[in-house]
Structures are given as structure tokens and as C-alpha cells.
Amino acid sequence: MIKKIILFFAVLIAIVIGQQPLNVVPYPQQVSIGTCVIPVAPGSILIESNIESATFSVSMDRYTNLFFPFSNESEPSSNESFLLSVTIYSDDETLQLGIDESYSLSIEQGSYQLKATNIYGAMRGLETFKQLIVYNELENSYSIVCVSISDSPRYPWRGFMVDSARHYIPKNMILHMIDSLGFSKFNTLHWHMVDAVAFPVESTTYPDLTKGAFSPSATFSHDDIQEVVAYAKTYGIRVIPEFDIPGHAAAWGIGYPELVATCPDYAANVNNIPLDISNPATFTFIQNLFTEIAPLFIDNYFHTGGDELVTGCWLEDPAIANWMTKMGFSTTDAFQYFENNLDVTMKSINRTKITWNDPIDYGVQLNPETLVQVWSSGSDLQGIVNSGYKALVSFAWYLDKQNPDNNIHYEWQDTWQDFYAADPTNNISTNAENIIGGEATMWAEQINQVNWDVRVWPRAIGIAERLWSAQSVNSVSLALPRIGHFTCDLSRRGIQSGPLFPDYCPMQDDLVFTMKPNTKLSKSEIKLILNK
């Protein structure tokens, strides 16, 4: 009883002095603290849902195994169990942009209630519930505070870009990445699959494409891709492929040299080589390839890159230059021609195109339905949303930069504060409603499975909260203790997320950091999840 009273007053004091009383990340929209603290014992919390779902069953099993990282054999065993009752109002498991991720969570003495419209809101609620379970190392005990939470994300698109082209990232490591993203309530994995240096995606239509991979073993099969998509679905994470064209296309030409431009003066930099858009066979190739690849993903969006096109290579290639002259094309016209043809392909495969902002910078008029990902600047973002395009913000969240622009921090991990301060609407005066979210990006020139965790976490936590929590939740000083607590929690879950300030994070004696997911899906589970 004394322990419960002390904890209750600690929470009360936090409220009085203006701190956020719950160590929950991202911070919920509405929180009401109750007047009780409930002791719980390892293994005592059971989850029961009112619907049958193979997808949600994976999530329930996952969190059941995560609730209690430490045993408390020193305390007397108790037969008392606590039932977390999950009520889901719809069995529709469609996972697309704009799904309802809201949930309500009520913890009272003798009653744990989680309610959501669908399984994806329930997944967000399970993560919050996990974070509410507090471990007291001195007492070797667990407790949970009585609380009422009503929560939903600020933005429907909360993405993270993984680059598995510049360094091959094994499938199991990508599944491990999905674990970390799901814990932080990201809901979109933007998979940058192909770039100038490598083409690691297997194609049954064009098998020589993987001649552009780093190694025959450094490739992704159709089965690999579908396992990633199914695993991500168990976290409510959409997976969107990116095939970056027309620039950054050199790897396409290793297996099929007729697809790319020839420009010796530019060839010293592999990033300079674009597709040959004067050859009609190029567009037939793209059409056939994307028709094969798109069904492996369940999302309605398909990212086609479009960044850093070196048009000088087109002008140096005699065949392309002659074609442009014949057509009366400037380089902007040629780029427009390519994007128009790409729109035809997107329509045929029933996908909505995403592109980086570069085509607009070149003067290309994109299809109004195109979603524009802005990596350049806030001023470009303002012009894009003023033109009526829906947009994603990324320019402020380049995690491969250990020292982001205007960094003033001594420790590079403190750059989470810069990411945290970068609200998508900063300096946006009009049409902010066209910003539907954003993405953190981790380009992989110097990143592979060995150092991915430590370069991403805990810095990406600030981005996760910025995209989920209310705009008014923006105090670095209030966020710091919560994020510090969560980074310790991530470490206990097998994510190598380091500290932000001097403290002590108790770890399990047998904790092993692996490049593997915390759950393994069987082939039958993958099929059930993808077909629901």
C-alpha cells in the first residue's frame, strides 16, 4: 500500500509542476490520471479480443511476451490475473492510407478496457498499454497506474524510408526494423528498393535485372517481399516500394544495357546514368516489370523516385539527343514525356504515384493525384501545397546526417531535438491541410544492418512523436524524460537504442541484440494475413 501511495503522489506532483505525467511515446491526445496504482505480476496479464483475426493474434502474442522483461521470483506467487479486454468494432482489415487508428484505453481497479474501430487502432493501444507497465528494480515488481486515454494520430502518413539498395539489408533485418517502427507508432515503411548502385529485386519477367545486385545472395525474392508486407501488417504498417527512375538507373543497365543512356563524360559517377526514354522498349519494360511487382504489395501507392535526374547525360547520348530534336523537346519536355508515360503505367496497375519534388523543380506538370515527397526545403513545400498537391515532409528528417542543418549540439544523439522541433507546418502560411504527414529517411551510403539501430534510435523517436502527437506537444524539456524512458524500453525489447542523458537502464541478464524479428510468421500465417 505504501508503494502505491508513493507512486500516486509522484504522478500527482508531476501534474502539478507541469510535467507530462505518463512515460508514453508518442504522447497521447487526451490523458486523465486516476487515483489508483495496481500491482501486477509477470504472466498475470491476459489479452482477450472480441474478434478472430490471424493478424491481430500475432500482435496480441507479441505484446504478451513483451509486458514483463524481468521475472520477480523473490515475491510470493499470485494466482490473480488481469484481463485486458479488447473490443474491436469492425473486422475490416483493409490497410490503406487514412484508416482509423484511434483507440481508447481505460485502466481501473478490476477493469482493463481497450476499444478501437479496427485492429490497427487496437495495435496502437496495445503499445500504449505496454508502456504503462512500470518496472521497479528496487522492489523487483511491476505496477500500472489507473488512467483513461483517448488517442489518435495527428497525421495519417507517418513514414520511414529504408534504403536497401545502397547497402543490401537482409530480410530478417528489415523485419527487425519493422519491430522498432511499430513500437514507435510509425505506420508506413517506404522501401527504397532499387538505386544506381544495385538492383536487388528478383523479377520472373526480367531475370537478368539481378545481375545488377551486389551478389546473387543479396536479393529479395517474391516470397521475401510478401513476408515483409505481411509482417508489417501485424503492426499496422503499410509497405510502399520505390523504384527510382528515370535517374539513378545504372543498375538496370547491367542486365539490360539497352535501357540506359550512354554518356561517357558523365559515367564516372554511377548516379548520373538515367534511363533511355527515347526507346519505346523502355516503357514496355517498365510496364511489364511494375505489373509483376505491384501485386506483391497491398498498398495503393507506388513510389517512382524522380530525384536528381542528370539531363546532361540525355543530351550527350546521340540517340536521345536526336530524338529530342525530332520531338522538339527541351530537357523539361523530355522529363514531362517520361512522367506522362509513367502515369499510364500507374493507371494500368491501379496505383497512385509518389515522386520526390524534383520533377516539379524542373517545371514538370504532374498528375494532380500525384503525392509529392519534399526533400529539398520548406519554401518548395509551400509552393507545392499551394499548387494543390498533397505532400509529405522529409527535408528536416534526414537521419543519415549525423549533424543536421543548423545543428548546435555537442552530442550527435541530441540532434533528436532538431527533428522534434521540425513541425511539418513550420513556416507554412497557406494550404497546410495538403500536408498529409511525413517520413524520416535513412539513406544507406554508410549504413547497413550492423549500425542501423544505433544511427536511427533514439533520434527517430522525436519524429514519431511529431507526426503522432498534438502540435502543442512540443517541449523538448518535457519530452526528454519520456523519450529517455522509452529508449531504455526499446533496448529491453532488443532494439539498440542508446541513452540521451546520464542514467541507468536495467537490462535482462540474457538480453541479446539480434538482427532478427521478435516474431516468426509461418507460410500459412503469411497467406492468411495477406488475404484478409
From Swiss-Prot:
Signal peptide, first to last residue: 1-18
Glycosylation sites: N72, N79, N350, N427
Family matches, as Pfam families: Glyco_hydro_20 (PF00728), Glycohydro_20b2 (PF14845)
MF terms in GO: beta-N-acetylhexosaminidase activity
Positions of the catalytic residues: E308
Top EC class, one word: hydrolase
Family annotation (CDD domains): GH20_HexA_HexB-like
PTM annotation, UniProt: The N-terminus is blocked. N-glycosylated.
GO cellular component, one term: lysosome
Keywords recorded for this protein, A-Z: Glycoprotein, Glycosidase, Hydrolase, Lysosome, Signal
Compartments where located: Lysosome
Paired cysteines (S-S): none
Reactions accelerated catalytically: Hydrolysis of terminal non-reducing N-acetyl-D-hexosamine residues in N-acetyl-beta-D-hexosaminides
Role: Responsible for the degradation of GM2 gangliosides, and a variety of other molecules containing terminal N-acetyl hexosamines. This enzyme plays a role during the slug stage of development in the maintenance of pseudoplasmodia of normal size.
Record's protein name: Beta-hexosaminidase subunit A1
Species name: Dictyostelium discoideum (Social amoeba)
Gene that encodes it: hexa1
